[in-house]
């Protein structure tokens, strides 16, 4: 006996881009039959004429990790057809939590009513599974989180001991369930990671069996092409798959550059580098407001940045710099 027949749906099967109209039969939790089921009996029959049926969507770039605990129903995604979600993007992840990384994550989690009761990925996912979640979920390990764990938000090159500690956290995180690594190279503290640090962490991920690197590029605007080259070179040098997150050419003066960046990705693929990009279908983005500040304004960490902004003389000087450096961009920024 078929449990459920979905009748007359327009089906996108995820393989052939051309949809087809037919019936689908479900037994238990499995799709058992696809075809004309008009003569078959079922416990339930859903009239899907005029509706579209597809496999669950994979949201490969999300920032709702803590919400898996705050509200396991995840209706905001389920109602969009998302059934699998990947967290830990843009260099920020729910683990590993050490030092400043633990303190900051506790603040972020508290904002959605979640109390930190884990330090590593296996502990986090055990809590998620125990509480229940409507989605299939997985996570990358963020290199902003690992760097923050060993050096806080301080700028500068990691010394050898700090770098080895960060690589150890990458390896341990993958052993405890992370799918790979991510970076957010416009954000503190990821923006301070140099080629040496990124290469070491990517190599650690590869050696741990998860050679995947997703990156929010160092620039998505004026320096987009150099930033794309940086990511593709890392893929080549570390022998890891590269995912360019929410790929775009930001700012109207840069829009045409996306053709050249896509050409760069195609050339890299032709050379044997595993490189892909994802994008969203609108000309807007959300991010932290402090990313518009000059880089040196963020030196010393968040408290040092806030102290500068509280100082009237320094705040005026920063405002003048922003007027000069972003004179043609203010009409595009909404708060």
Features from the language model and the residues they span:
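N-terminal metal-binding scaffold of metallo-dependent hydrolase/deaminase domains
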Residues: 1-40
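Divalent metal-coordination and catalytic microenvironments
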Residues: 9, 29, 50, 61, ...
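Secondary-structure transition/capping motifs at alpha-helix termini
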Residues: 38-39, 204-212, 233-242, 267-274
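Hydrophobic or amphipathic alpha-helical targeting/insertion segments
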Residues: 74-114
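Hydrophobic, small-residue-rich alpha-helical packing segments that form membrane-like cores
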Residues: 90-97, 110-237
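Acidic, Ser/Thr-rich peripheral helices and adjacent loops at domain boundaries
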Residues: 103-116, 295-305
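Active-site neighborhoods of metal-dependent hydrolases
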Residues: 128, 134-160, 166-187, 241, ...
């Amino acid at each position: 006996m078929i449990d459920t027949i979905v009748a007359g749906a327009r089906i996108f099967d995820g393989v052939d881009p051309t949809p087809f109209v037919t019936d689908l039969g479900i037994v238990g939790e499995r799709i058992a039959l696809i075809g004309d089921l008009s003569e078959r009996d079922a416990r339930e029959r859903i009239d899907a004429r005029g509706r579209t049926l597809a496999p669950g969507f994979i949201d490969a770039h999300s920032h709702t990790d803590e919400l898996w605990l705050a509200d396991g129903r995840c209706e905001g995604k389920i109602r969009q057809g998302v059934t699998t979600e990947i967290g830990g993007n843009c260099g920020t992840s729910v683990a590993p939590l050490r030092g400043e990384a633990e303190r900051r994550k506790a603040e972020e989690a508290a904002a959605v009513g979640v109390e930190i009761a884990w330090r590593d990925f296996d502990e986090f996912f055990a809590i998620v599974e125990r509480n229940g979640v409507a989605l299939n979920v997985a996570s990358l390990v963020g290199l902003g989180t690992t760097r923050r764990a060993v050096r806080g938000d301080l700028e500068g090159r990691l010394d050898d001991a700090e770098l080895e500690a960060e690589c150890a956290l990458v390896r341990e995180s993958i052993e405890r369930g992370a799918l790979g690594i991510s970076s957010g190279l416009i954000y503190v503290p990821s923006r301070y990671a140099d080629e040496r640090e990124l290469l070491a962490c990517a190599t650690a991920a590869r050696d741990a069996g998860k050679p995947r690197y997703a990156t929010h590029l160092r620039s998505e605007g004026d320096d987009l092409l150099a930033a794309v080259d940086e990511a593709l070179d890392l893929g080549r040098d570390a022998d890891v798959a590269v995912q360019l997150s929410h790929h775009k050419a930001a700012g109207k003066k840069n829009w045409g550059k996306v053709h050249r960046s896509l050409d760069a990705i195609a050339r890299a693929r032709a050379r044997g580098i595993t490189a892909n990009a994802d994008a969203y279908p609108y000309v807007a983005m959300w991010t932290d407001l402090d990313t518009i500040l000059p880089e040196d304004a963020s030196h010393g960490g968040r408290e040092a940045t806030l102290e500068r902004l509280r100082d009237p003389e320094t705040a005026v000087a920063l405002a003048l710099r922003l007027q000069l450096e972003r004179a043609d961009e203010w009409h595009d920024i909404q708060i």
